[in-house]
């Protein structure tokens, strides 16, 4: 039986990535695409590279008959999914790619996103969408909250280590290089080609990045105490990808062994042989995350590097992976995409 999906916010990059993935999914059919500001336009007008798919035209959300929908992907700006979720039929599965349900405490949402939570009564239903660590809860969930792309990249590098006793939890430094698609598709002066080309610059520095809320939430639960990491992202002039370099106090061979054991049976997480480090280009367009570990000339220091495609494994691919579990489908269905290289 084919399951019918609606994508809300389909005119953005994550919406287009969902369409690209679902176009070859054997069990999920795209039944509706919404984008209020572009309603009435053909999808091929917004994304000409998907012209061959013969997709439904974009409509306003209120034009969708959700009683005929099995699954909703919300790829909406912050604040728009919260009031919507409670209005959808209870039998509809929902995967929110935005930030509206990532943080369990509505006060944390207010702190990091500057908005009052519009659906605190719904928040307890939401399961955090880092698939590899919340698989059992996701299978039974009605609502899954996708992670931030930076949050996913760093957590894949660090989660197996946080409660292991192998690293100093008070000495974690994470330096990220981010492709510009993570900033979305809307026009921004600092994202113009002349502004970004041939430049690397930090942003949201000094403990201000919103994804820090996810690290605080997840790592502190794992450790059983407060954990605060130092985290600085940088924009680099590439379209897709995130590469996180995590500097740790710990024995590097033991760190590598712990990560290799944790991910030995994971279909989308690849831990490279000790001493090999991953490249952003080797995961672009795929749902894979590559992780490498090496030592340093300073004894007792480890470098863990993780990389993934922010639009795929960091967002839309993760969303489909979660949807597969929610719908009782094989987790890898439609997702064994080979990376695009060169």
UniProtKB/Swiss-Prot annotation:
GO cellular component: cytoplasm
Pathway terms, separated by semicolons: Amino-acid biosynthesis; L-arginine biosynthesis; N(2)-acetyl-L-ornithine from L-glutamate: step 3/4
Catalytic reaction list: N-acetyl-L-glutamate 5-semialdehyde + phosphate + NADP(+) = N-acetyl-L-glutamyl 5-phosphate + NADPH + H(+)
Phylogenetic placement of the source organism: Bacteria, Pseudomonadati, Pseudomonadota, Alphaproteobacteria, Rhodobacterales
UniProt keyword list: Amino-acid biosynthesis, Arginine biosynthesis, Cytoplasm, NADP, Oxidoreductase
SMART domains the record matches: Semialdhyde_dh (SM00859)
Family to which the UniProt record says this protein belongs: Belongs to the NAGSA dehydrogenase family. Type 1 subfamily.
The name this protein goes by in its record: N-acetyl-gamma-glutamyl-phosphate reductase
Subcellular location: Cytoplasm
Transmembrane segments: none
């Amino acid at each position: 039986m084919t399951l019918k999906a609606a994508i809300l916010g389909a005119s953005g990059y994550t919406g287009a990535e969902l369409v690209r993935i679902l176009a070859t999914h054997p069990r999920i059919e795209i039944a509706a695409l919404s984008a209020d500001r572009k309603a009435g336009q053909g999808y091929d007008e917004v994304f000409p590279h998907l012209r061959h798919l013969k997709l439904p035209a974009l409509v306003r959300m209120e034009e969708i008959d959700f009683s005929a929908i099995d699954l909703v992907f919300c790829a909406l700006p912050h604040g728009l999914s919260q009031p919507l979720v409670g209005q959808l039929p209870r039998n509809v599965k929902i995967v929110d790619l935005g930030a509206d349900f990532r943080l369990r405490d509505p006060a944390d949402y207010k702190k990091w996103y500057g908005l009052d939570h519009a659906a605190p009564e719904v928040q307890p239903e939401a399961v955090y969408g880092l698939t590899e660590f919340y698989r059992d809860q996701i299978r039974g969930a009605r609502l899954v909250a996708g992670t931030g792309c930076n949050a996913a990249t760093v957590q894949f590098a660090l989660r197996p280590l946080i409660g292991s006793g192998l690293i100093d939890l008070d000495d974690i430094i994470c330096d990220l290089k981010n492709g510009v698609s993570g900033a979305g598709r809307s026009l921004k002066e600092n994202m113009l080609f002349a502004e970004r080309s041939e430049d690397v610059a930090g942003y949201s520095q000094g403990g201000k990045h919103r994804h820090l809320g996810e690290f605080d939430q997840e790592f502190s639960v794992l450790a059983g105490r407060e954990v605060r990491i130092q985290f600085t992202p940088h924009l680099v002039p590439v379209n897709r990808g995130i590469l996180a370099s995590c500097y740790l106090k710990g024995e590097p061979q033991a760190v590598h062994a712990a990560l290799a054991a944790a991910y030995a049976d994971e279909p989308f997480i690849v831990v490279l042989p000790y001493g090999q480090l991953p490249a952003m280009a080797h995961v672009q367009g795929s749902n894979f995350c590559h992780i490498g570990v090496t030592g340093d000339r300073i004894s007792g220091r480890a470098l863990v590097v993780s990389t993934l495609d922010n639009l795929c494994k960091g967002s839309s691919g993760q969303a489909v992976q979660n949807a597969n579990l929610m719908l009782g489908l094989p987790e890898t269905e439609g997702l064994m995409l080979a990376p695009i290289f060169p």
